[in-house]
Amino acid sequence: MLGLIFRNRFVPFSEQEMQPEFLAVRERVSALGDAGDDVELYKTMIEGMARMYLGAWDEGIEVASILDINLAGKLYEPGATVPVEIASLYEHEVPLEGRYAVQVRFLDPSEEPIYESDLLMLEGLAAVSTEVVIPREADSGRYLVEYSLWEEDASDPIVRTSRSIYVIEAFEERITAMLFDSRRPQLRRQVGRSSSRALANTTVLWHLDMYQRGRREWLAGAYMGYPVIMNQIFEQGTLMVEPMQFDSEIELAEEFINDLGSGRDPLSTRSGDMRLAYRSSVDRELVPFRLFVPDNYDRSQSYPLVVALHGAGGDENTFMESFDGTFKENARDRGYIVASVNGRGPYGGYRDASAQDVIDVLDLVQRVYPIDETRTYLMGHSMGGGGTVRIGFEHADRFAALAPIAGYGSAEDLAKAPEMPLFIAQGELDALVPVERARNFHEAAQALGMPSLHYVENEGTDHVAIVAEVMDQIFDWFDLHRR
């Protein structure tokens, strides 16, 4: 069951009860968005979420929605100081009736506290600055700067959430060495030898850019960059994902540089989960994607391929890290190569450059890996489900079957390739994509007489949980279909 921890109690999300409130808030948000009033838009969204999920909107919740925690960077060495600022997102229009305090804790990779500040009383909602010091003996890993807001004399916090940082031993030395080695002439000569080596090189360039950015800015992954009150909601769900595992993936970049510099192809025999990057055919930007290659990978064999499209707010990590691991698990067990695209951001909508990202990744993976082009499939969730329908039917000659989850298209999409095998999945209690729309889409497919059509509607299932529930069935469906 999905929910959130707020004021020390678990509040379940009841999508069926949310529907009227959700629709009303959506109408207000839409009107404010058209008016261009970002502050009122944010306040309305937060108030609506609080009323829907908590049944209340009081001063403490409003203060929690106004304050946010800011960190100066994402990546640090042992012994470094991490500046922390708690500041208001906008001004509170009337004097506060209550008194409030914030507390900052620093948690190690096992989420045990290393440091805990005193309660820092707020003067109105003026910014509070503090810092945490990373121990010199700290191991590499993911650490948390935890923030909590308290009403004076309360026994429990109003809200508690965190921002993550990564500690990497000898970070500055390693980045400097990689920057130097990546510019060596012998490495650059390798790039033009094959598409595989070129992909390894653009992957290195993207990783170096991310590590340099992480020195000077806090990098958020899917659903992580929201203000703390929203962040806490997403923490209790299943979609929050780091942009990358900085402490371990630095080794991947180092290995790629060493292999290329020694004349070896880093991707020729490598299996497992990899974060790769290529240059977009649209604007030459470096764009990441995730790729999973099954164990015992053998270039003399051909492999089926699934390309997955994330939903709104997600990124290339969503399918690989969320949904109870069912996406990679099926790929591993069945011997599939699977790719999860970035879509040019969390809200690209799989149109224009966002749609081209899907085709670029498909083309690239088919060039670099021995893919069975008669067994290439497309699937997606929510916004990615709509993208699956739109792109899949537009490029019907590229795919053997499609599987949109909690996303749909139009009868016009279906008419482009009515022979396309189509698996449609929907949760009955979906508050974001009403079940009626999925049923209507299924009926449109039936009206076309599509010869290979399967519809799954799970009772009592919401917008997110449906993905893991149907993943095995989708791969079963893919197993049955060739182009």
Where are these regions (language model features)?
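Short, compositionally biased P/S/T/A/G/V-rich stretches that sit at domain boundaries
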Residues: 46-80, 87-91, 182
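Short, surface-exposed loop/turn segments at beta-strand-coil junctions that are enriched for proline
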Residues: 93, 133-140, 294-298
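Short substrate-entry loop that stabilizes the transition state in hydrolases
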Residues: 297-349, 431
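A domain-start/cap signature at the N-terminus of enzymes
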Residues: 158-303, 453
